UniProtKB/Swiss-Prot annotation:
Location in or out of the cell: Cytoplasm
Gene expressing this chain: uvrB
Stretches assigned to the Helicase C-terminal domain: 431-597
Biological source species: Escherichia fergusonii (strain ATCC 35469 / DSM 13698 / CCUG 18766 / IAM 14443 / JCM 21226 / LMG 7866 / NBRC 102419 / NCTC 12128 / CDC 0568-73)
UniProt motif (Beta-hairpin) ranges: 92-115
Record's protein name: UvrABC system protein B
Single GO BP term: SOS response
Record keywords, A-Z: ATP-binding, Cytoplasm, DNA damage, DNA excision, DNA repair, Excision nuclease, Helicase, Hydrolase, Nucleotide-binding, SOS response
Molecular function GO terms recorded: ATP binding; ATP hydrolysis activity; DNA binding; excinuclease ABC activity; helicase activity
Length: 673
């Protein structure tokens, strides 16, 4: 099923890219465990990594710091590798309230979560691809370090069907039930099966648009075929097929029985400890809750909150790391940590927050001590599990630099010839009036301005002041969610307004080629928002414009300012020298504004077929770009119901049309999530 990685791009590596690709590949072939790619904004870091993957033909996991950036990377990788398995693995919760107890008010908060089934399907598709194929790129968020079903148990539970095999129909149905598939002869949807005589139709949990038909002759599998679950049209006949479990957390019956005995032993030991400490209420609470879970597991094979018993179900010892997505990555896999200066500290912080909450639950009798082993990886465990790693950032952190031994692969020269912004330092006393005059100059030539302040109050006051003086200005603050933030950036690029004011505008990921000026107020106030890395990231926001300029307002030059200015000048000098040697004139980027929400596949608007009676239900332009993930999901559910209705009425053309629209809505949903 695997194919070789085949890179699809109209461009050839240029600028610093060929040298960066060569050095990274040499390092990987020499067995270097850690390498750092220092790639400036707009230098084509993703393209460089795609070339490395294609040349070395190794399965790869790309870690991104948030869902927005993960969606963007997923789209870019899908464009680079249209014929290979590019997968998406992020948290499938639209909403998640973990189980918690507040001793001060004696308040227990039940776990409450809303699972998004489309992302769940993509997660299952990702692990399936990692187990079956070599040509796989999985773009993941920090969700990858959280506990997942054990791959060994997951593989044991798979159902293999081949043409000619002897198997009883009841045995197939029993195995499907063990895989947590449900029988539904009326509504055929993902994770269900239906039976019609000697024909079993199965809709695999990881599939979006293909189902399996198993035709039996007595106790022999006579034919296996793949078909479109919507139209019933046969796509192809196949010699064999493997059905994967409906969830990552499925466990064989014998393992559950063994786990139940181990849970009983731990419960007895914990009860003894609680009674010795005169904690009668806690002992009663723990006994009641655990006995209920054991009865559920005995009857159904699972229970609510079964992840708290994951240590017993996976057969691991106390304190051992939980199975995660890293266990599915082959031994020769490659890990790429994007925006590593943000992602690495995130990985380090996940374990501690989770531990503090669970210790309270254990202490007050809501959970057994083994629940502490249902956790994300500790940082040391992540380091031990990580394969050969490439850290990618414009401002690598101390950790990455230390691990790479100071040998950093530079990617400073942009293929477009664009230079890093010119930097000026101006006094604080006149910063607001000076800024106003700069804004007017830029607005007159249809260019945009970003302004970053130190406090929320100052950002609000500055926005008000600029509005009073007739400037078109918006203020970006922490209460704005991802979708609205993307909408504001889109409006800035379209010229709905000229100035965007914020406190922390160095958010990695989305780029704005129209921005020609970045103004940093109070740049001489040393601290988190004015550190060397923050300054370089913020200055980089103007690096995609030919007239890029950054003004730092400060009465003195701090060590962070000096380092940021020095690094920017070093890059600019190298870029200028390269341009002169190769006769390159810097070219501005004409990136389409719609690209902000693009996810790799250009979904063509569905055209009416036949006699032109049918028309698309959801044209792209009719979908508000600021729809929340919840609203998008509701729209998707409505259309799915309508699609099934058309299919039942044998109106397959209309149903197929809605299906195409659903593809587009799901792409939008991933971006919004």
């Amino acid at each position: 099923m695997s194919k070789p990685f085949k890179l699809n791009s109209a461009f050839k590596p240029s600028g610093d890219q060929p040298e960066a690709i060569r050095r990274l590949e040499e390092g990987l072939e020499d067995g270097l465990a850690h390498q750092t790619l220092l790639g400036v904004t707009g230098s084509g870091k993703t393209f460089t990594i795609a070339n490395v993957i294609a040349d070395l033909q190794r399965p790869t996991m790309v870690l991104a710091p948030n869902k927005t950036l993960a969606a963007q990377l997923y789209g870019e990788m899908k464009e680079f590798f249209p014929e290979n398995a590019v997968e998406y693995f992020v948290s499938y919760y639209d909403y998640y309230q973990p189980e918690a107890y507040v001793p001060s008010s004696d308040t227990f908060i039940e776990k409450d979560a809303s699972v998004n089934e489309h992302i769940e399907q993509m997660r299952l598709s990702a692990t399936k691809a990692m187990l079956e194929r070599r040509d796989v790129v999985v773009v993941a968020s920090v969700s990858a370090i959280y506990g997942l079903g054990d791959p060994d148990l997951y593989l044991k539970m798979m159902l293999h069907l081949t043409v000619g095999m002897i198997i009883d129909q009841r045995a197939i149905l029993r195995r499907l039930a063990e895989l947590q598939y449900t029988r539904n002869d009326q509504a055929f949807q993902r994770g269900t099966f239906r039976v019609r005589g000697e024909v079993i139709d199965i809709f695999p949990a990881e599939s979006d648009d293909i189902a399996l038909r198993v035709e039996l002759f007595d106790e022999e599998v006579e034919r296996l075929s793949l078909f479109d679950p919507l139209t019933g049209q046969i796509v192809s006949t196949i010699p064999r097929f493997t059905i994967y479990p409906k969830t990552h957390y499925v466990t064989p019956r014998e393992r559950i029985v063994q786990a139940m005995e181990e849970i009983k032993e731990e419960l007895a030991a914990r009860r003894k400890v609680l009674l010795e400490n005169n904690k009668l209420l806690e002992e009663q609470r723990l006994t009641q809750r655990t006995q209920f879970d054991l009865e559920m597991m005995n009857e159904l094979g699972y229970c609510s909150g079964i992840e708290n018993y994951s240590r017993f179900l996976s057969g691991r010892g106390p304190g051992e790391p939980p199975p995660t997505l890293f266990d599915y990555l082959p031994a020769d896999g490659l890990l790429v940590v994007d925006e590593s200066h943000v992602t690495i500290p995130q990985i380090g912080g996940m374990y501690r927050g989770d531990r503090a909450r669970k210790e309270t639950l254990v202490e007050y009798g809501f959970r057994l001590p083994s629940a502490l082993d249902n956790r994300p990886l500790k940082f040391e465990e992540f380091e031990a599990l990580a394969p050969q790693t490439i850290y990618v950032s414009a401002t690598p952190g101390n950790y990455e630099l230390e691990k790479s031994g100071g040998d950093v692969v530079d990617q400073v020269v942009r293929p477009t010839g664009l230079l890093d912004p010119i930097i000026e330092v101006r006094p604080v006393a006149t910063q607001v009036d000076d800024l106003l005059s700069e804004i007017r100059q830029r607005a007159a030539i249809n260019e945009r301005v970003l302004v970053t302040t130190l406090t929320k109050r100052m950002a609000e006051d500055l926005t008000e002041y600029l509005e009073e003086h007739g400037e078109r200005v918006r203020y970006l603050h922490s209460d704005i969610d991802t979708v609205e933030r993307m909408e504001i950036i889109r409006d800035l690029r379209l010229g709905e307004f000229d100035v965007l004011v914020g406190i922390n505008l160095l958010r990695e990921g989305l780029d704005m080629p129209e921005v020609s000026l970045v103004a940093i107020l109070d740049a001489d106030k040393e601290g988190f928002l004015r550190s060397e890395r923050s300054l370089i990231q913020t200055i980089g926001r103007a690096a995609r414009n030919v007239n890029g300029k950054a003004i730092l307002y400060g009465d003195k030059i701090t060590p962070s300012m000096a380092k940021a200015i020095g690094e920017t000048e070093r890059r600019r000098e190298k870029q200028q020298k390269y341009n002169e040697e190769h006769g390159i004139t810097p070219q501005g980027l004409n990136k389409k504004v719609v690209d902000i929400l693009a996810l790799g596949q250009n979904i063509a608007k569905t055209k009416a077929k036949g006699r032109g009676k049918s028309r698309p239900i959801v044209e792209p332009d009719n979908v508000p770009m600021d729809m929340s993930p919840k609203a998008l999901q509701q729209k998707i559910h409505e259309l799915e119901g309508l699609m099934m209705q058309h299919a039942q009425n044998l109106e397959f053309e209309e149903a197929a049309q809605i299906r195409d629209q659903l593809h587009q809505l799901r792409e939008l949903f991933i971006a919004a999530s």
